């Protein structure tokens, strides 16, 4: 069994959106736009360091990549991992 607000609220929202908003919005739209201005999306035109972007090529090289490539034994003996919580 569905609760009453689960039926009534969507119906009221539909009635507002369909019938009341086209009548009310032209009057309150200018008032709302003063308080809540729309932000225009700005696209950057590559003003950053071009050489740095050419070198990186979109790949992130970290120290962890080197360890995986060389294997864990390249950095010395592996330390045992404890399953117990240490406070």
Curated annotation (Swiss-Prot):
Similarity comment: Belongs to the UPF0729 family.
Protein name: UPF0729 protein C18orf32 homolog
PANTHER family: UPF0729 PROTEIN C18ORF32
Protein's organism: Esox lucius
Pfam families, per the entry: DUF4512
Residues annotated as signal peptide: none
């Amino acid at each position: 069994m569905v609760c009453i607000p689960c039926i009534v609220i969507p119906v009221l929202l539909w009635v507002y959106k369909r019938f009341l908003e086209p009548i009310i919005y032209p009057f309150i739209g200018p008032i709302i736009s003063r308080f809540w201005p729309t932000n225009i999306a700005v696209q950057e035109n590559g003003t950053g360091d071009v050489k740095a972007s050419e070198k990186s090529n979109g790949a992130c090289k970290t120290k962890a990549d080197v360890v995986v490539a060389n294997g864990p034994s390249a950095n010395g003996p592996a330390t045992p991992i404890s399953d117990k919580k240490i406070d």
